[in-house]
Regions:
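Short beta-strand/loop motif that positions the catalytic acidic residue
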Residues: 181-182, 188-190
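Short beta-strand element of the alpha/beta-hydrolase
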Residues: 39-47
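Catalytic active-site module of serine/aspartate enzymes centered on a nucleophile-bearing elbow/loop
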Residues: 229-246
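Primarily recognizes the serine-hydrolase "nucleophile elbow" in alpha/beta-hydrolase
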Residues: 103-162, 169
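Alpha/beta-hydrolase active-site loop
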Residues: 85-106
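Catalytic histidine-centered segment of alpha/beta-hydrolase-like enzymes
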Residues: 221-231
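Conserved alpha/beta-hydrolase "acid-adjacent" motif
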Residues: 195-201
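Conserved alpha/beta-hydrolase
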Residues: 62-81
């Protein structure tokens, strides 16, 4: 079996898990919706900052709406596959994300929605591209989708982000993947003041996507949606509801 999950309970609010992908361990955190398993599961893919801060806040809010949420540490994933000069391919990244979705879906399979933010959004789109059937991935919600996603991460990349520079890492283009995403429903959420991907660029990416799709713009919001989390959460709720009807 190419992917397995081991569970270690760390408290009532969340469970820390380890997901083994092609022999390498990547942190996963489950935030259950309640005493019973929810009908739909969400895999939350944060940005290159990993599983911390705002990413956890967003995931906890989604769980509070009655969804089982699994927070995948995108930064750690990229780091463990960048060891010794290695780099992922786009095909490997997409396959890995699909494997995580399949494991989270469980048996019998339940629908899974990938909610990605920034780098995580590019990874969610990659996972959806080229699927001939939606199961188990029934939809993607992309927050602050960039034009490209990276295929590796190291300490120099972290310093580049702090300095507001592009990390010197191999990357993949998002636009061609968007056109290959149909029939998986795509819900875009973008801040009008996003400092990494301009709104006009985000609109252009949206036009490249296959149907069904929908885009919501949050006026005044930056890439982190600071000061606009209420609007963000409302848009997320609408997106999850919309995906369940498609």
């Amino acid at each position: 079996m190419r992917l397995a999950i081991g569970l270690l309970m760390v408290g009532q609010l969340a469970a820390a898990e380890a997901t083994v992908i092609r022999g390498r361990t990547v942190p996963l955190t489950q935030l259950p919706s309640g005493p019973s398993q929810s009908r739909l599961a969400v895999v939350f893919l944060p940005g290159d900052g990993g599983w911390r801060g705002t990413a956890i806040t967003i995931a906890r809010n989604i769980a509070s709406w009655g969804f089982d949420v699994f927070g995948f540490d995108t930064k750690k994933y990229l780091e463990v596959f960048s060891a010794d000069g290695e780099r992922l391919t786009t095909k490997e990244l997409a396959s890995d994300m699909r494997a995580v979705a399949e494991q989270v879906a469980g048996m019998p399979n339940r629908p899974v929605v990938l909610v990605g933010w920034s780098q995580g959004a590019s990874m969610a789109v990659a996972a959806a591209a080229g699927l001939h059937a939606r199961t188990p991935i029934h939809g993607v919600i992309a927050l602050g989708l960039p034009q490209s996603g990276v295929l590796g991460w190291d300490w120099k990349a972290t310093l580049a982000v702090v300095a507001h520079r592009e990390p010197d890492q191999p990357a993949f283009a998002v636009r061609p993947l968007l056109s290959a995403s149909s029939p998986v429903p795509l819900w875009f959420i973008h801040g009008s003041e996003d400092e990494y991907t301009a709104l006009d660029t985000a609109r252009s990416l949206f036009r490249s996507a296959g149907e069904p799709k929908h885009m919501e713009e949050i006026q005044g919001a930056n890439h982190r949606f600071e000061g606009h989390q209420s609007e963000l959460f409302q848009a997320l709720q609408r997106g999850l509801s919309w995906i369940t009807t498609h």
